[in-house]
Amino acid sequence: MKIDVIKNILEDAKVCGLLATITLVNGQVSHVNFSKHIKTFTATDDIILDEERHLVTIIDTDGSRDYIDSDSIIRIFSKEGL
């Protein structure tokens, strides 16, 4: 998936307070949680998008980080908090 498309989707999720589920080619799933209502997943503090290296870095409030190659992303699903 193109990094600029990913950037637009994740920025919308941040602004709107959504949960975004990122599905990778190998079947793994990662979550970006900007919702204040969904407590099932750790809240996301920030996202860093490195367009040059096609790298998405998800930084959670508990200090954990996910590093994802944007070329391995096949689907992003977002939904409002319940």
Predicted segments with their positions:
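Short, surface-exposed linear segments at secondary-structure transitions and domain or protein termini
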Residues: 1, 38-49, 75-82
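Short glycine-rich, low-complexity segments
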Residues: 1-30, 76, 82
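Assembly/interface hotspot detector across virion components, adhesins/toxins, and nucleic-acid enzymes
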Residues: 3, 19-21, 45-47, 55-59, ...
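Acidic, low-complexity, intrinsically disordered interaction modules
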Residues: 26-65
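Short, compact, well-ordered microdomains
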Residues: 60-82
